[in-house]
């Protein structure tokens, strides 16, 4: 397995951190965007969006960081990062979607729109802080959402 990554971004870093923390058998290839490695025909066949990360597992290519985390956690249940029951899995999915669609979009926009986004920032971090109250991790136990 091989991960094509661009380390400076949060979505790439979280996948790299998961792989490194659990010492998973995944080769990490740091992308060179200056030389437009992500625009080659070969890369665009793996990810038509031309973005990173991408996980290549044999002839299977997977892009989107949360999908990659879920795939790796499913392949490696010994990590204990993905619950086996439907409710636990749905709860992980909820927090992964929330992170991707709400929290990350706010963080990305902070530099340009901090003042206008303060209400959204307060709301979303309030949700996160309330969920973390009295616990170390979002779901209580460490999982892929953390």
Stretches with model-predicted labels:
Residues 107, 137-146:
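GST superfamily/GST-like fold recognition
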């Amino acid at each position: 397995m091989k991960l094509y990554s661009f380390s400076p971004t949060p979505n790439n870093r979280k996948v790299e951190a998961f792989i490194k923390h659990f010492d998973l058998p995944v080769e990490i290839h740091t992308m060179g965007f200056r030389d437009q490695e992500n625009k080659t025909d070969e890369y665009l066949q793996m990810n038509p969006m031309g973005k990173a990360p991408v996980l290549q597992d044999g002839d299977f290519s997977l892009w989107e960081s949360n999908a990659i985390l879920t795939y790796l956690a499913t392949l490696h249940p010994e990590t204990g990062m993905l619950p086996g029951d439907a409710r636990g899995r749905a709860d992980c999915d909820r927090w992964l979607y929330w992170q991707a669609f709400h929290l990350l979009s706010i963080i990305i926009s902070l530099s340009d729109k901090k003042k206008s986004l303060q209400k959204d920032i307060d709301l979303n971090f309030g949700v996160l802080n309330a969920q973390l109250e009295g616990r170390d991790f979002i779901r209580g136990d460490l999982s892929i959402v953390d």
